[in-house]
Structure formats: C-alpha cells, structure tokens
C-alpha cells in the first residue's frame, strides 16, 4: 500500500510537471498566433518554437537552420484549421514536405513530418488532439496485434484505447478512485 502511494505521488509529480510545461508551450503559441509576440520572439523564447522542437523531440524532422523554421511558422500562421485534426496533420505535413522544409528521409527525399505536425497541433489544441508518437504507435500495435499504417488507423485505435481505459466510467478509473 505504501509503495502504491509513492508511485502515485511520483506519477502525480511527473504529470504536473509535463502538464505545466505543455500549458506554457500552449500559451506561448497562442500569443504568437494572436500577434501578441512576433515571429522572431516566438522562435527563441523560453517556451518558443526552438525549445518546443527540442523538448518534444521533433526538431530532427525539419530542415536545419532558422530560415526553414521561420518559413514553417509563416506557413502555420496562414494555415486554415478545420475540424478534422487527422486531416489537418496530413495536409500540414504534406505542405511542409512539398516546400522542402522537412529533413531528408531514409528514402532520400524530404520526409513527411507527421509527428511534428501532430505535436504542434496538440500544443495548439491540447483539449482536442493527442500527438502522433512512435512509442504510442508501437504500444497500440502490440495491444491490438496488428500494424497501423495510416494516421486514421492510429487515431482510431488511440481513441478506442483512451475511451476503454481513461473514460470517466472505465473500470480502471473507477478502481483508482476507490483506492483513495
């Protein structure tokens, strides 16, 4: 029982740390999107674009240097966001790739930066989107015993998993609440 409390306390601390960090990235991004801060400021601020790329581990998917990053931020600022986040990820990733702003893939051409786009859109709309992540992808493939080849498949299985294990009425959430 004592170990459960220690684990829960550590998990709470980690969750709080990451949520506060995510919240700071979200606030800074919204300040940029609303023209409260300019492009250069957002690029280099404490919770700005360069730090986001590093902390979220997606900087390697984009072309090196400030110029491509500034072009990506301009592209994002002009991007028309709709209601289908999965489609937005694919469309934005394709635009970045087509403009030659992503890094080279293992196949020799510019890569498709889906992970970057999903994490960026997550920071923009944290209440509406979960990020596309290779570790989550592998976990979902193990959980469901099948390869997930498209963003649609990934998000369908991720949402199913979320609703199964983390909905307010799931058995797991009820068990956790009963232990308090």
PLM feature segments, named:
Residues 1-108, 126-180:
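An N-terminal alpha-helical hairpin/helix-loop-helix interaction module that forms a charged
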Residues 117-120:
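Cytochrome P450 catalytic-core helices
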Residues 123:
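Terminal substrate-recognition subdomain of acyl/acetyltransferases
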């Amino acid at each position: 029982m004592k170990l459960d409390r220690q684990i829960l306390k550590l998990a709470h601390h980690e969750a709080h740390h990451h949520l506060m960090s995510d919240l700071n990235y979200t606030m800074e991004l919204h300040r940029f999107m609303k023209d409260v801060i300019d492009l250069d400021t957002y690029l280099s601020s404490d919770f700005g674009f360069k730090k986001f790329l590093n902390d979220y581990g997606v900087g390697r998917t984009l072309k090196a240097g400030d110029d491509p990053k500034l072009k990506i931020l301009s592209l994002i600022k002009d991007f028309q966001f709709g209601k289908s986040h999965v489609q937005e990820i694919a469309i934005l990733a394709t635009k970045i790739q087509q403009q030659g702003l992503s890094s080279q893939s293992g196949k020799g051409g510019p890569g498709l930066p889906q992970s970057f786009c999903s994490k960026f859109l997550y920071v923009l709309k944290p209440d509406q989107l979960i990020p596309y992540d290779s570790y989550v992808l592998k976990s979902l493939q193990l959980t469901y015993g099948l390869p997930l080849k498209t963003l649609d498949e990934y998000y369908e299985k991720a949402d199913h998993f979320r609703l199964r294990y983390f909905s307010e009425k799931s058995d797991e959430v009820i068990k956790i609440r009963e232990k308090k």
